[in-house]
Amino acid sequence: GYVTADDVEKLLAQQPTDYLLLGQTLVNNGALTNAEFEKALKDYKAENQITDDISDNQTETLHNLINEFYHFDNDENARICTDYVTLLFKNLIRFIGDDFTPMEASVIKNFAAEHIVIQKINGKYNAEACIATDSKTYMAFAERFAKESFTEVDDFVNATAGEFLNVNDGLFVVNESNEHGVELTLTPQKFLENGELALSGTAFCIPVNYPFGKLNFIIAT
């Protein structure tokens, strides 16, 4: 069926990140263009006095630091990788916490872990974004994002970790459209348990250490 104005208001009122999920769903379904979603997002933030945690100046500083630290300039898709990781770190600060330490990145062809969340980005170019970690860290990561406690890794923990990746990737897709005129779509997330991820093209693994454990973020272009 169709999404009504009342449905939109109810969804927007539920949780801080729900308006992002709603917007990305509407874009994926063709109900909104990326430009329309961006306008609606700005209007919603203004009406509800929602502000980004990081200013434009801070974003530029973060962007430059990431580029210098990870040496993405050596990769043919340097701009894409730098923009993606800048957004990722902003969303980690916003949704998970700023108590993390970025570790040196490595170029990989495959990666094995107890839990891997995968989402593909398709369009003018193709990319793959992943979160890989052990069970304890995976559950703690989901707890921070959901602001709930979990006792075991189950479908809800998977859905929560997948929701973080989808929110981040959805915002990345919107930014690519608005800032660079690049139209992209997202595939549904996939989950691997005790598996190994095989990657094509250039793939960077970016470890991030939190007090609760190490998360490995992978971006392949």
Which residues fall in each region the model found?
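Intrinsically disordered, low-complexity segments enriched in polar/charged residues with Gly/Pro
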Residues: 11-12, 105-107, 193-195
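Short, charged low-complexity intrinsically disordered segments located at boundaries
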Residues: 26-28, 55, 117-124, 172-174, ...
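Short, hydrophobic/π-rich interface segment
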Residues: 154-203, 210
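Short, highly charged low-complexity linear segments
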Residues: 35, 52-58, 149, 184-204, ...
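Generalized protein targeting/export and membrane-interface segments
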Residues: 53-155, 207-221
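Non-catalytic accessory regions
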Residues: 1-83, 90-99, 110, 162, ...
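A generic "cationic amphipathic patch" detector
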Residues: 39, 105, 181-182
